[in-house]
């Protein structure tokens, strides 16, 4: 027998190798799940009598800092920010301020220290030393929430003052400090025994004290007294392959630092500084004035190159901080510039409201020459189109120009709604005889009475109110020329037919409120945390919502309306007035047609930081690392489940 040629033998070996090999792709091995381990530090952790301003903290592998400017907190606060950097396996910290005597310093890294390859975080890592004989080790922790909507507040400073005077917050930097994470949580470390005031501050100028009304703040009325005690908690070792199964539950003995559940409600004070922010002539026929704060009165205008008497229709919002002036005279509208003297109240250097006079020039964005050129160009274009059509024997129909009006009268009208008329420009006159409402009775339309009412909040908006009956059909007619605008145009005719929904089309929610104040207001919210409807709690501590849409999710918020003005009000530090309290019902309702829900709500039953559902929070927690999940997925692919 002839020997097998070498190339055939080699081919057989290769075929045999592939026949025995796995058909899958080569596996690169498990992911690194181990965070960096602390090895040593100079000075040693919790060292006393330290005078060194340079710190070196070493780990067992190459590391990096993740978002150090957000996550690394140094206490007490420093006038000149220390330098924090990475060098291989080490974190280096250098202080530039003179170290204070007999003071505990903490460098809280949070989860900023991660390994160089997989970003595994060394969570909850902090380093401390003392310049004196003793090191302070107690902690104070809690959560900062936005007072008006219970959103977690990320990145706000939280500080302690040993000085218990109210003035300390506005005159002195904090003694100890921390910063909230994405969940609003904070931990102030290195705290000595004693009594403290606690504050939160969104410190825009980084001076660690409240000196600007634009800064969000929070404060507690009560003192904070740090304490600690031994405690036991249960911990769990989870199954590596099954996230729903655990291997072991064991007890962990630890030192619990108190208080650990403080709630601070963050708010911005009402801006007390009154001044003109800007003036703007948005269009030929109107201009607007914008002020920095709400006002009790409107400014007074005196024309310097025109007669201001009966010259404007004025629209202002409820705060009187945004005011729109519609110019009634069309000739006056065409003027490039309007100059006037404005008298109003403004805040002086002493913080007092005093009379002030400004001279303002309202300039058209497009001057008259350019406007005339544009108009001539449009006329030429129209004439060209007319001649083109004329050659074809076609005539260009001249469309009359009407006063623009939109009618919100849906074909299926909710029982708790009305027909709404909206106008782009102010209305001069409404002929109510030209408006007709009718109901269908045995296939015939019968006129019914109605009320036409101007909206008290929204300018240029009117509502048509009638005795809407469930399941009935209605007809709205508005004759042409029935409504006239201030520039002489009239509305076109309108005809709408609509049918009112039945009672069976809605769900109903009955609430029994426990723990609310004497003037509480309940707000029904949508999935964007926006207010759909609101109404006060009754003397019997009930609040009922009718005509709720089926297959719609509703959420509920309550605020204690202390001054009984129907709106939520912010706080004031100088007056020691907290913002009005807000609560969320930690539940969502998905309404059903022809279905009634009844619920008792104790507003204090669930801690404040657990009340607002995650699904409607805008401030989401930072994404946690999920390397272990990747290893579980790898195990499944390898058939090791």
Language model region names:
Residues 2-641:
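N-terminal targeting or signal-anchor segments and their processing/structural boundaries
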